[in-house]
Regions:
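Long, contiguous binding/interaction regions
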Residues: 1-50, 54-163
């Protein structure tokens, strides 16, 4: 039976050095793997960065990716995050078109979704929202009804739940 393609989230702790991101990206491209999302930032230790990578692959391919990442120089730890024991979040910044007649409805939807309005002008609101992928997708779909001028979305970030 063929394995299904699924989305997987991998956390990679790396030494915070020049060229590490290029080596990780090169491993993916050199083996024909696609990175669906990638976030990189410092961890609690300034000498260590955390890469959160999502891929859409079969389980067997995921295992290969993890093994290959673990072999790279400057990689400290590779963890495959599973949905049940991990907290996932994303961030979206969206500029939504508004009119006098739609302004209150957009603001009400922002309140319902616990989004923050971070910039206002007569024809637009800039909104910041964090949450799960599903929550953000639904919010974006609702904002499309008003007209989205611009949007940027982070990939997933993740941490294991506290024990």
């Amino acid at each position: 039976m063929e394995q299904p393609i699924q989305r997987h989230t991998i956390s990679v702790l790396v030494e915070n050095k020049f060229g590490v991101l290029a080596r990780v990206a090169g491993m993916f491209s050199g083996r024909g793997y696609n990175i669906h999302t990638l976030n990189v930032g410092p961890s609690h230790d300034p000498k260590v960065s955390r890469m959160t990578i999502t891929v859409r692959e079969k389980e067997e391919t995921l295992n290969q990716i993890i093994k290959q990442l673990d072999r790279l120089v400057d990689v400290i730890e590779v963890v495959d995050f599973r949905e049940g024991d991990t907290i996932f979040r994303e961030l979206v910044l969206v500029q939504v078109n508004i009119t006098k007649s739609t302004r209150s409805e957009v603001i009400e939807l922002c309140d319902i979704f616990r989004a923050k309005i971070i910039d206002v002008n007569p024809n637009q609101l800039t909104v910041e929202i964090t949450g799960t992928e599903g929550k953000l997708t639904k919010f974006i779909q609702l904002m499309e009804n008003f007209g989205i001028k611009d949007l940027t979305r982070t990939g997933k970030i993740a941490l294991p739940r506290a024990e």
